[in-house]
């Protein structure tokens, strides 16, 4: 991990003082995750039609992610699905608004075969970003094939985004 950070800093001409907040915010986000201080996640799933869409819709519909069964800590997950041919800014914005009205605080964009083309996930990302809603793209988080696994990984990551960003911003402004 250290070698990766050093390579990244060297290759991108990043000064060490510019990265201090990353470690702190990541630690705080990890602590928040362990303690269950996580954001509710809205998943915007996308797939083509026919059998692909039928199967993907089921794989994209995540259940709440249990963090600690004994005390009931979980990541609350809300789901919506858009057929690829219906994917427009207007439709995306309506679906994001619906997820937010249900209680989602962050958005995950996930598409069947998204690792092969991230364009559709990027459309969702851009719409959420314009609304100032934290967003994570499943295919950007992991290149694993396996729609449910990729989406779940992105949902877990997205659930700690608000805490991580708040800590990073607080650290940077101090």
Name each model-derived stretch.
Residues 1-174:
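N-terminally biased helix-coil "hinge/interface" segments that flank
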């Amino acid at each position: 991990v250290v070698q990766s950070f050093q390579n990244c800093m060297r290759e991108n001409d990043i000064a060490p003082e510019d990265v201090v907040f990353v470690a702190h915010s990541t630690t705080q986000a990890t602590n928040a995750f362990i303690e269950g201080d996580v954001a509710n996640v809205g998943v915007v799933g996308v797939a083509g039609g026919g059998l692909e869409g039928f199967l993907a819709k089921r794989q994209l519909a995540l259940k709440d992610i249990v963090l600690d069964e004994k005390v009931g800590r979980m990541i609350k997950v809300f789901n919506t699905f858009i057929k690829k041919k219906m994917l427009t800014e207007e439709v995306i914005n309506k679906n994001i608004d619906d997820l937010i009205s249900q209680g989602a605080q962050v958005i995950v964009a996930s598409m069947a075969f998204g690792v092969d083309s991230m364009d559709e996930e990027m459309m969702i990302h851009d719409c959420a970003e314009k609304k100032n809603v934290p967003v994570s793209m499943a295919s950007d988080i992991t290149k694993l094939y396996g729609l449910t696994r990729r989406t779940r990984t992105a949902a877990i990551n997205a659930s700690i985004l608000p805490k991580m960003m708040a800590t990073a911003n607080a650290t940077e402004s101090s």
